Amino acid sequence: MLALLFAATSYAADTIKLGGMFPLSGRASDLGITCKQGAELAVKEINSKGGVLGRKLELLSADDKANVQEGVTLSKRYIQKDGVNFLFGVVSSAGSLAVAEVAKQEKVIFMDTVASTDTLTKEKWNRYTFRAGTCNSQEANSLALYAAKNKKLAKFYNIGPDYEYGRTMWELFKAKTKEQNPKAQFIGEQWPKLFIPDYTSYINAILQAKPDAVFCSLWGGDLVAFIKQAKPYGVFDKMKWIIATGGDVTVAKALGKEMPVGLIVDQRYYFHWPNSKRNQEFVKAYMADFKDYPSAWAAEGYDGVYFLAEAIKKAGSLDTDKVIAALEGLTLELPRGKATLRKEDHQLSSDFMVGETVFDKAYPFAIVGKAEVFPAAKVLYSVDEWKKAQAANK
């Protein structure tokens, strides 16, 4: 049965094993599949140059279905039956917290890639968990600062998924918006469950509330379904929309010409940002292997593998304590630009982009235009804030 759960390239027994967990089915599958592909590309590149410490990397992959218990079960199987050296991946924020707890108990390093709750590297921090991707504070704060430039936006409404990610994003967005505009009002909120089929009641509630702007943290297939259902009601013309991860290329491709123009959106990485040689090389290699533009999730999977590989090389060993020490403060030049795993909290520190949806004749889908880049120091929670959170949890 176990052989049916895991897919991996066949290597010798002395490979360095990464136990990958990704949603490979259902509405979250675009995130999981492309994250897995990005990780596979990194493994291929590193192995083509001899691997690490003379050993090949091996990525095991399993469908965690974006389910918390599934992630816990897979993590334990990977460690106890497959003998993985690292846990890797995860899209669901709730799932990442559960996997991090397994990593802590088993004393195995977990490299989170997509799941972005601040709680993972802040209130529930543990020394075995690192994040190679963006966290909620970077995302929500950047969106709030970008939206604050529009002085006509005073009344805000929320629609977000009813779990850790959605609720945290709304609280962070409100706090930063209130800081920028003390007169801002937050007039309502809606919390649909993940993966529901019908958003009609939520759309009608938004129309009745008549906000100036809606903050939306639906993502992946849920965001695609919501936009398709909401567009006939004219909601995207009647109010401004601020959509976290709305610049996701997998969402843009799924919607095609149905994507509304002028949405304020973010993306943790974009295939034409930054315009660097490193990013251009990544896009070229990814498109050669997968015949598609890389998503942010692909970049986060790719980055996570490179962080682990460089740390193992730096440590000169697979000893957990030595690899942790090598990961702490590690800085790499990645497709997203220069990025550092902060020593204190193990959170990735890198620049962040927000813009608006536009159409460009060069692409068959909407892209992110009118972009503004926010330095990590301006939007990521500070080390002092992290220390206060740690003290409060003792």
Segments predicted by a language model, with ranges:
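Extracellular/periplasmic bilobed ligand-binding domains
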Residues: 170-268
